[in-house]
Amino acid sequence: MAKGSREKIKLESSASTGHFYTTSKNKRTKPEKMEIMKFDPTIRKHVAYKETKLK
C-alpha cells in the first residue's frame, strides 16, 4: 500500500491558554507552518493558532 502524504499536526493557541486543536495537512503541498484564526473557548475569543508538533 502507498504511504499517505498527510501528517497529523497540533494547532496551539497563541493566547497561552493551553487550548489546542488537532488536524492533518499535506506536507508536500504545504511545507510551511500553518497559522489560522480559530475560536479559543477558554477566553471566548478568536485568536491565532500556530502549528506545533503532535507528540
Curated annotation (Swiss-Prot):
Keywords in alphabetical order: Ribonucleoprotein, Ribosomal protein
Protein name, entry field: Large ribosomal subunit protein bL33
Originating organism: Polynucleobacter necessarius subsp. necessarius (strain STIR1)
Domain of life: Bacteria
Homology family: Belongs to the bacterial ribosomal protein bL33 family.
Pfam families xrefs: Ribosomal_L33
InterPro entries given in the database record: Ribosomal_bL33, Ribosomal_bL33_CS, Ribosomal_bL33_sf, Ribosomal_zn-bd
Region Disordered, annotated ranges: 1-32
MF annotations from Gene Ontology: structural constituent of ribosome
Bias kind Basic and acidic residues: ranges: 1-11
Spans traversing the lipid bilayer: none
An example Gene Ontology CC term for this record: cytosolic large ribosomal subunit
SUPFAM superfamilies per record: Zn-binding ribosomal proteins
Comp. bias intervals (Polar residues): 13-24
Any single GO BP term: translation
Lineage: Bacteria, Pseudomonadati, Pseudomonadota, Betaproteobacteria, Burkholderiales
